[in-house]
Regions:
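Beta-rich catalytic cores
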Residues: 25, 32-33, 64, 80, ...
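Short glycine/serine- and acidic-residue-enriched loop/turn motifs that recur at repeat junctions
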Residues: 1-16, 46-67, 101-127, 156-183
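Short glycine-/Asp-/Thr-/Trp-enriched loop segments that recur within the blades
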Residues: 19-24, 75-79
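Short coil/turn segments that connect the beta-strands within blades of beta-propeller domains
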Residues: 33-34, 43, 88-89, 98, ...
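Short loop/turn motifs that cap or connect beta-strands within the blades
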Residues: 13-17, 71-74, 131-132
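Conserved core positions of repeat-based scaffolds
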Residues: 35-38, 47, 90-93, 102, ...
Length: 183
């Protein structure tokens, strides 16, 4: 039908290129509950959609955007994003040298646990590093948790664990993190 896509269709989004250089191509993309983010081939990170839960990386809980906007970075930021993964309450990015950064609300972004830097607040409106045991090669976010594959082959997860999704025991305390021991 007119409202569906098949394998030979493209998605036409009027205004999608607003603010983006016409030469930039999408390198990676992920969608969450009410927002989406993409990494462009220049390794910049852009998000759009509903801004609640700090999803757009704008430093506040109120912004929403129907067109892609760049995620806020500190002055002098030079590291490049190579992948992005969105959950329902948080988003995570993988940077070029294996750092994982997350932003959003609650423990899903890593708050209140040993994997989070001391500067991480309960609600983080901008990307904040997750303290992993080694550099990451992949990050994936679920409803209220995330996991990363590390260069040494192990997996570390953080966030909610009501159903044992962190692989550290069924219904452990919310916010408890642990190494899954997957090799």
């Amino acid at each position: 039908g007119a409202d569906t896509l098949d394998t030979h269709s493209s998605l036409n989004m009027p205004g999608f290129q607003s603010g983006l250089a016409s030469t930039n191509q999408t390198f990676d993309i992920s969608s969450g509950a009410d927002s989406a983010c993409m990494v462009l081939d220049d390794r910049s990170l852009w998000c759009w959609g509903y801004g609640a839960d700090y999803a757009l990386g704008q430093g506040n809980n109120e912004s929403s955007s129907s067109t892609p906007i760049p995620v806020l970075r500190p002055a002098g930021w030079a590291e490049q994003t190579i992948a992005v993964s969105l959950g329902s309450y948080h988003n995570c990015e993988l940077l070029a040298f294996g750092t994982v950064q997350c932003w959003g609300t609650q423990y899903a972004a890593g708050a209140d646990g040993p994997l989070v830097s001391a500067s991480f607040s309960y609600n983080s409106g901008t990307p904040t590093p997750v303290a992993l045991d080694a550099a990451a090669v992949l990050v994936d976010s679920g409803y209220d948790h995330s996991c990363a594959i590390l260069v040494n082959g192990s997996v570390q997860c953080w966030g909610g664990n009501l159903y044992g999704q962190l692989a550290v025991g069924y219904k452990c305390v919310t916010g408890t993190e642990g190494d899954c021991g997957v090799h």
